[in-house]
Amino acid sequence: MNPTVLTIIISSMGLGTTLTFIGSHWLLVWMGLEINTLAIIPLMIRQHHPRAVEATTKYFITQATASALLLFASVTNAWTSGEWSLIEMLNPTSATLATAALALKIGLAPLHFWLPEVLQGLDLTTGLILATWQKLAPFAILLQLSPLLNSNLLLLFGVTSTIVGGWGGLNQTQLRKILAYSSIANLGWMITILHYSPSLTLLNLILYMFMTLTTFLLFKTFNSTKINSISSSTLKSPLMSVIALMTLLSLGGLPPLSGFMPKWLILQELTKQSLIIPATIMALMALLSLFFYLRLCYATTLTKAPGPINMASTWRTKSHQPTLILLTSASISIFMLPMTPLILMLMT
């Protein structure tokens, strides 16, 4: 892609997200979401592959539907209350419609149908943007609306997402689909606690973005899109295969890694709110997610790709060294659990 065009596209994505962050008027926020959506479409379609075209079409239709529903919710709220301010959504029907629209935008179950198929049709770089950056603007709105939203509806979306994310990833062999269901499950954890502790949602979102960034960068380095293609990662770089192992276990929420921290704090908060049954269901579904992460760990570090030479490494193998971005994100994804007391102190 032309560097000038790429610069304009990336600047537009940044502008759209910034507008949503700073906006307090519904139309300005909606405009930011639309700029964000339209900016990523050229990146999705640049491959000129039928699967990329299909993924882009699905993404555009889904996001357009969600944007129309969100605009309808804001107009309805302005009609009934006379307020266009983001934090003045006093009409319960408008708040419910806005929640459903934002759930469709980020891919919460049962409105998740588009996310695995779209992510599967994209290359890993664009998939990384879709799984991380494109979540920021909708979550900025959700965090501002959190006191006004229906807690039961958020709980329904959250628990359903953890169930779908856990079960959906079990029989997948495509890495991008596994990461899509992983995203759905993690979004479920975030949205469940949104009404009770927005700061925990923000903490979970930040850690999720770092862990997803590390995972996508590793798969891009290994040039892997299927489970059976990452078995040669140990030959390419033993250090990076160990980083992949630790990051995947952290995504699964295994102690003593960073990914355990938000799950632990969220379950603790749900228990304080006497939501024992949702907390139990989510903890059990986390075990299902951990199972398919363990499958990836087994394929990454405990299997060896078939080859004609019985050697640890061949002269043809290109040496892969982790970059500074990868090392930084991996460190945050793996070693943040001892910082929990400090983070809790900053949050209170």
UniProtKB/Swiss-Prot annotation:
A GO term for molecular function: NADH dehydrogenase (ubiquinone) activity
Q: What does this protein do?
A: Core subunit of the mitochondrial membrane respiratory chain NADH dehydrogenase (Complex I) that is believed to belong to the minimal assembly required for catalysis. Complex I functions in the transfer of electrons from NADH to the respiratory chain. The immediate electron acceptor for the enzyme is believed to be ubiquinone.
Quote the protein name from its UniProt record.
NADH-ubiquinone oxidoreductase chain 2
Q: Highest taxon of the source?
A: Eukaryota
Protein topology in the membrane:
Multi-pass membrane protein
Cell compartments where the protein resides: Mitochondrion inner membrane
Top-tier EC class: translocase
Residue ranges crossing the lipid bilayer per the database entry: 3-23, 25-45, 59-79, 95-115, 149-171, 178-198, 199-219, 242-262, 274-294, 324-344
Mention any Pfam family matching this sequence. Answer: Proton_antipo_M
Which BP terms from GO are recorded? mitochondrial electron transport, NADH to ubiquinone
This entry carries the following GO cellular component terms, namely: mitochondrial inner membrane
Q: What is its EC number?
A: 7.1.1.2
Homology family: Belongs to the complex I subunit 2 family.
Q: Which reaction does it catalyse?
A: a ubiquinone + NADH + 5 H(+)(in) = a ubiquinol + NAD(+) + 4 H(+)(out)
